[in-house]
Amino acid sequence: MTKYHFTSKDFNVFNVEGLEPRMVALIETTRPKLEALGEYFSSYLSQHTDETFYPHVAKHLRRKTNPPNDTWVAFSTNKRGYKMLPHFQIGLFDDHAFVLFGIIYESPEKERMAAKWQQQVNDILALDRDFIIKSDHMKKTYETVHSLDEDALKRYIDRLINVKKGELLFGKVFFPDDAALMSDKKFLAAVEDTFFKLLPLYI
């Protein structure tokens, strides 16, 4: 039984038409995996940071008409929520899974994290070639970190501070045919490796 890695059934959830039918498919197919990943990686992050991390599985409760285009589990040090804090995420759209760390527009800690990342520009640029950067967690679009020079990365960081809706996230994406999505063992190893390499941007 597939407990952790996403399969075509999970990606196909987002092809189901209508809010209620899609939510039924999501709850039956994908949410159990997000809950399992939440338990596994809240423990992993707690062990590697000496802080207690809590999982937050997306419920999509605010949606009244439009079905969700993605779903996720987020990890933060607050038991009640994650949006106000720097946090880690595992989730998927219809065409790729994502493993991310960053901060979104609701957080009052954007300036603190931007100052930290400004001191880590060289470390960020030295991430593996398949690491990505994105400035809107609700959109699929991203760039590879490898494609950026120092000035371009600094513009991303400056935007985090200077734009009210500014966000900044780093991580990896995995397409449905990616080797990491062929088994639970491979996916857990890929997520562990991604989080481990992102931890210096958090600690």
Swiss-Prot record:
Domain of life: Bacteria
Family statement: Belongs to the UPF0637 family.
InterPro entries: UPF0637, UPF0637_domain_sf
Species in which this protein is naturally found: Macrococcus caseolyticus (strain JCSC5402)
Protein's name according to its UniProt entry: UPF0637 protein MCCL_0722
